[in-house]
Amino acid sequence: MATLKAVVFDMDDTLLSINLSAFIGVFALDEANLLAQVARKPIVSLFSPLGSAMLALNNGDRAQGDTRTNRQFFADEIERRCGIPILEPAIADMLDFYEREVLPKKNDRTISARPREGAHEAVQTVLDHGLRIALLTNPSFSRSCIECRMGWGDMLDMPFELVTTWENSTRVKPSADYYRDSLAKLGLAPEETLMVGNDPKRDFPSPSIGLKTAYVGAGYQPHALWSGSMADFAKDFDRIEERFCNGE
């Protein structure tokens, strides 16, 4: 019989309800504007390289031996594509200030970020069962940017043992290496852990590593241990844990 030791959660549209496309649009436009000012370039000249660099990061098309953090990978792509060294201290500090002090104020009716129904109850139920928790959000953003969204979801005080960011990760979802590396930092095996997420692609490791997923997205996922709404997760958790331990 398997033993469940930890539950690891996705964030966007799992614990946090958010119009992610709107958020990315605002974030990308603001950062492009800042970099355009630094480089003294027209802002429109940065849209393509910024988008291409982010796409390259999220495509995960990297050599097996590439050990750069996602932050370093993105910075290298930006410098190669438009000549801006975003890790230089003055530029890095400017971007960090924006993400810590300005971005949190950008939540509006369009982005509409707020705790997802049932999210806090889900986390508390897992903790009440004596299990460990971590936040395995896709690490294609900085710690500051991720903490901004955690704040919108009232998650900053949750006792996550790990939050994956582009500073501490070398791959993105759904890479099996991303999941393996994240669990290794926690001292956990995939067979001891339950993933909770809404994305039918990114929240299922590829290739499979034996990590089971409770799916809280739209529709039904035949490969999930359990499918349902975030609001139902806490109510069904005893049954979910039983199915996990029975190897279903």
What are these regions (language model features)?
Residues M1-S52:
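Active-site neighborhood of HAD-like aspartate-dependent phosphohydrolases
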Residues S52-L103:
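A metal-dependent, Asp-based hydrolase signature
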Residues A36-S52, R80-F97, L156-F160, E191:
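Short, surface-exposed acidic
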Residues M1-V7, H120, Q124-L127, L136-F141, ...:
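Asp-based, Mg2+/Mn2+-dependent phosphohydrolase catalytic module
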Residues D66-T69, A92, D96, L103-A134:
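Short, acidic loop-to-helix structural element flanking the phosphoryl-transfer center
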Residues A22-E31, D66-E79, S140-F141:
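Short acidic alpha-helix initiation/capping motifs at coil-to-helix transition points
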Residues L20-F23, F27, P115, C145-C148, ...:
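Residues at alpha-helix caps and immediate loop-helix transition turns in enzyme cores, especially N-
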Residues L15, S21-A22, G60, T137-F141, ...:
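Short histidine/acidic/glycine/proline-rich micro-motifs that form metal-
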